[in-house]
């Protein structure tokens, strides 16, 4: 086995591209990659608004955010010569101007400023889950992937789908590869929204299939997506999954209910909030009213341990 290791680039620069609308950001992504950036990451308006309410991000946002954009695309270039990377930022500005976006780039050449920008982006899930109230961004379609030429139309159709079911979605992450982390905002304590979860998932996967995309472009396809493998892979491949599982794990001890013979993704017994869920009435001794009570503050947790 040969590992093709590469040295870590000596320098990095970052262009924070501001767009009036989410759709324009998605439409422009396919052109940004022509500059061969190392990353193009999306930060949507919802994430910016939520981050602006969190003290640890407020000062950071002021240093790279201009006005109230509909979305940001963070475009990073890396290499050995800083002068060449600065030229890339110039080309980035010129490219956006040709598409009608003048003075749209905040340049981050100072590593400290770059870190502050990435701190906001890398806290994306934590920021999204800080949404107050029972409705939360729900993981079910969060790593579908499509070609960049289809990205604007695909995301537009998903927003129409969310509107059809009386909700909205949150968006962030890997625009450069057409794999955005999108989550519909639902209250899974309610049976009605649990039904919406399934409907949105099924209809989204049908849309993804139209574009010959992937229903699981990054995160894996366990409890939520295994049920839909036949739609994406076909019966023959799914049968092969079952044969391999039977050979190596005949008693189904390893990760039961995932990939092979899965449960329904909307089985509420598997939910964080099951059908019988009731919040605990805890007298905390502290004032949690800003969060709607101590139990609501606890429910903001997304279990990733970043705090």
In which residue ranges do the predicted regions lie?
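Noncatalytic alpha-helical scaffold of FAD-dependent oxidoreductases
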Residues: 1-173, 178-217, 222-307
